Amino acid sequence: MICTFFGHRIVPNEIEPTLRSTLIDLIDNHDVDLFYVGNNGGFDAMVRKVLKELSERYAITYYVVLAYMPQKHGGIDPTDYSDTILPEGIETVPKRFAISYRNKWMIEQADYVVTYVVHDAGSGAAQFKKLAEGREKAVIELAFIG
């Protein structure tokens, strides 16, 4: 089973234990072993941190799904991209639509979608949460747990 994530750029540190316990439940009780996470904002960073920790204890795989090809500056790129992937076909998408394309791709792959959405106004996270619900994905909202 596959899980992906959408959340606001700014998130309180207090949700990290809830995120961790939610992921452990998905791994232990719902056979989730593959995770796709973006690389934009605080929620994504928190998810990556927790997944890295859990990957040391559980047989799981996670990938950071990029919206753009990484750019090299000065000819040398010291960044390790071994845990990243690009969605198939994204190279043909105009840059201004790349994040939306990436997010839709992540939803299509997922069985579960974990979100942290506390407001809808101008929120891409809220938009993609609604899309996941419309595609009948199992959506777990962390904002109101605990």
How should each PLM-predicted stretch be described?
Residues 2, 9-146:
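Acidic/glycine-enriched connector segments
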